[in-house]
Amino acid sequence: MDGRRFSRATIPIRINTPQQVSHAVITAAMKVHTEHGPGLLESTYTACLQYEPKQVGCRSVTQVALPVVYRGVELGYRIDLLIENLVVVEIKSVDGISPVRQAQVLSYLKLSGKSIGLLINFNVVHLKDGIKRFVNGTDWK
């Protein structure tokens, strides 16, 4: 050793599987919730959650369009966050997660062809109680 100290933040981390990305997003969400707690707007949590994964080299995109066409009429959905083009993240700040919101994430997975989705509700005392993970099939794309 030459006496230099390295923190985890200075060591490049390869994050390239849906499982690794999912773990990185959950870790980032925990950081955001620890700092800000419950009660903010979804848009604030989305901005914070987009920032954190970028710090470890992950690409993230907000408001990703999922077009659906029915009889010539374009309908569409928007994914809150898509991390590394692998993991769909739907962010909420509500009193409770209804089955409709869970079905929403499953629909996003089906329409996007992605294998892992996270539904994260920041309006809870302990964030572990606000995270639901969804898997679309068994193919880890």
Regions found by a protein language model. Give the residues of each.
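A short acidic/basic microdomain associated with nuclease active sites
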Residues: K54-V69
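Solvent-exposed, charged helical/coil patches
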Residues: M1-G57, K128-D129, R133-K141
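Acidic pyrophosphate-coordinating catalytic loop
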Residues: Y70-E74, L127-K128
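Structural motif corresponding to alpha-helix initiation and N-cap regions
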Residues: L75-G76, Q102
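Nucleic-acid nuclease catalytic cores
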Residues: K92-D139
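Conserved catalytic cores of phosphodiester-cleaving nucleases, focusing on short active-site segments
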Residues: G37, I79-I97, Y108
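Short beta-strand or tight-loop elements
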Residues: V64-L66, Y77-I79, S115
